[in-house]
Amino acid sequence: MSESRLLTLRDYIRWAVSRFHAAGLFFGHGTDNAWDEARHLVLGSLHLPWEISDSYLDCRLEDDERAELAEILRRRIEERIPAAYLLGEAWFCGIPFSVDERVLVPRSPIAELIEQRFAPWLPAEPARILDLCTGSGCIGIACAYAFEQAEVVLADLSFDALEVANVNIERHDLGERVYTVQGDGFAGLPGQRFDLIVSNPPYVDAEDFADMPAEFHHEPELGLACGDDGLDLVRRMLAEAADHLSEKGLLIVEVGNSEVHVQALYPEVDFTWLEFEHGGHGVFMLSAAQCREHRELFRSRLEK
C-alpha cells in the first residue's frame, strides 16, 4: 500500500472504495456497498461517529492513525475479514454490540420486527421472551429494550457464543432481567414457557454453505450450517415449541433461503411468512395454537 499521498480521512475512504472494488470484496455484514463499508471502517477504526460532518473528512491523520488504518484495510482486503470483527463491534436495531469470531455478525431482518414491537402479531406485552440460538445476544437484548418489563433468556449451544452474549448483557446493564442458558435447542430449558420465542438458528444448507463468499467463512460454522437442507435444528425446534410457548405465545424463526425446504417438508402447515420493508426474507411465524395443532406432524418429520 503506497500511503505517501493518503493524508486525510477522505483520502483513505476514497482509496479503500477503489481497492474494495478491485479486490471483489463481498458486502453483507452490516453494509451493502463499498462506499459505506469504507466509511464504516475508516471512521470506526479511529473511533469517530458515522454521522460526522463531511467537513471533518479533510482532517489530516497522525502517523500512528495512518498505520493502524492501513493495517485494518489490509486485513479487510487480503484476509476478507468482515468489518465488524476488525472493529469488534456491530450495530443491530440501532444498538451497539461487541462481536468477534465466536459469533455471527448481527444482520437479521428480525430487527425490523423488534423495532415495530412485533405489531400487529403479538397479542399482549410479553412477560417472558426467549432468544434461541442467541449468538451475540443481539436479538434478545434488542427485545429487552423494546419490552422494558420482560424477562429475556438468551440460549445457545456454544459456550463461546454465550461468553460474548454475557459481555453484551453487561455492556447494556441488563443483568437483572436478561440471562444466558447453555444447551442444545430447548434442552437447557425444561418446563419453561415463553410468550415470545424468536430464533435465528443455523439454517444454511450444504450447497449454499459451500458457495458462500470468503467473508462468511470467518464466522463460526456452528452458527451457519445445519445439515443437507439446513433444517436439522429447525425440525427439532418445531417439534418441541408447543411445550415451551405460553397459551397465546408466538414462535418467530428465520430460515432464509431454506424457506423452500420448510415449505416442501411441511406442506400441511399454514406458516405466516413475514414481509420486510428494508429487505430480508425467509422468516416465518406460528402461533402457540398452531404449534399444538401440528405437534405430532412436526415430531413425525424429525427424521428426513
UniProtKB/Swiss-Prot annotation:
Sequence similarity: Belongs to the protein N5-glutamine methyltransferase family. PrmB subfamily.
Function in brief: Methylates large ribosomal subunit protein uL3 on a specific glutamine residue.
Protein name listed in UniProt: Ribosomal protein uL3 glutamine methyltransferase
Domain of life: Bacteria
One Gene Ontology cellular component: cytosol
Reactions this protein catalyses: L-glutaminyl-[ribosomal protein uL3] + S-adenosyl-L-methionine = N(5)-methyl-L-glutaminyl-[ribosomal protein uL3] + S-adenosyl-L-homocysteine + H(+)
Source organism: Pseudomonas aeruginosa (strain ATCC 15692 / DSM 22644 / CIP 104116 / JCM 14847 / LMG 12228 / 1C / PRS 101 / PAO1)
A GO BP annotation: methylation
Keyword Transferase: yes
Enzyme class name: transferase
Record keywords, A-Z: Methyltransferase, S-adenosyl-L-methionine, Transferase
